[in-house]
Amino acid sequence: MISFFRAFFLIIIISFLIFVGAQARTLLGNYHDDEMLIELKLESGNYGRTPYKTPPPPTSSSPTHQEIVNGRHDSVLPPPSPKTDPIIGQLTTITTTPHHDDTVAAPPVGGRHDYVASPPPPKPQDEQRQIIITSSSSTLPLQASY
């Protein structure tokens, strides 16, 4: 039984050495084949194929930094309109009704799911109240008065 394991072990070692030798030959062979391949390329030209010609680069100038950021446009775009700064301390008046504050969104139970219910009709004018929201440049939260 021990002789069987020794024979098996020797076969594995011999196979490994053959494998390493073949790899070494392949690596050395590829090195020499590259030199021969260069000689063949010089002798045979382009192997019967016509080489692919790349198209010439566009004749337009290279893009500027601004064109890279914004992208090139065939027509010149007008400059963007100036933005107005918000007025600090501006008062905004919002009119709401009390029943809108109490509404809760509930998912539909059945039937059409794409139907959105309209808000309830407003109550008479005397029950409405005004909310005034003031804002400032400070980091304090917005204040609301009823």
From Swiss-Prot:
Residues 47-128 are annotated as: Disordered. Residues 25-48, 67-70, 86-110, 131-146 form a propeptide. Leaves. GO terms for biological process: defense response. Induction: By wounding and methyl jasmonate in leaves. The modification 4-hydroxyproline is found at P51, P55, P56, P57, P58, P63, P79, P80, P82, P119, P120, P121, P122. Glycans are attached at P51, P55, P56, P57, P58, P63, P79, P80, P82, P119, P120, P121, P122. Coiled coil: none annotated. GO terms for cellular component: extracellular region. It is found in: Secreted. Keywords: Glycoprotein, Hormone, Hydroxylation, Plant defense, Secreted, Signal. Residues 1-24 form the signal peptide. O-glycosylated; contains pentose side chains. GO terms for molecular function: hormone activity; signaling receptor binding. Activates a lipid-based signal transduction pathway in which linolenic acid is converted to jasmonic acid, a potent activator of defense gene transcription. Induces synthesis of proteinase inhibitors I and II in leaves when supplied through cut stems. This is Hydroxyproline-rich systemin.
